[in-house]
Amino acid sequence: MPFGSVGAMLSQMEKETSIEKVIILKGAGGRGKTPTLHLLIDLLISKWATRIHDDGYTSDIHQDCFVILDLPGFGNVGIITYGDRGCEADVQKALNECLGRGCRAVVGASHMQYYKNPPTVYKILWDFGSTHNAKTVETTTIIKADGWGQSINETSLNTICAENLFNLLLKL
């Protein structure tokens, strides 16, 4: 096989495994970002995704984690629940792992601020999408307003949000 063909083949492989989508689930602390992303992980696993990288995933939906799932027919998806201040290095490490594992999409939690100094999780995620020319979307959880909607189950709202994130992954 001529060298040019190998180069073209490697270029095509890189193109097929480049980051295409970055979804930022943003919001203030205690708004359900981590539980929603745990529900998204469970939803993807129910769609036959397999975990190929696991850093801290447990059945505790309030426990931060980072996983990479291989979703049949789609490819690898990185899901990062670290979004609080002080987690910037963990988020950057997770993004590097996503690149190394050929993720097509990344979904990450973040507080809402986009400050340049120091770089926030939001800025790190946003800049990551921009650097890789990915389709980048920010969204929020569905928030139950205080004082009304007492009968609304927050798990139901988080499940609806997780289903919306799943649709964004597939249709964005």
Question: Each predicted region: which residue ranges?
Answer:
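Glycine-rich phosphate-binding P-loop
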Residues: V22-L44
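Pre-Walker A-like glycine/lysine-rich segment at the N-terminus of P-loop NTPase domains
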Residues: M13-K21
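A short acidic (Asp/Glu
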Residues: M13, P35-L37, A89-V91, K116-K123
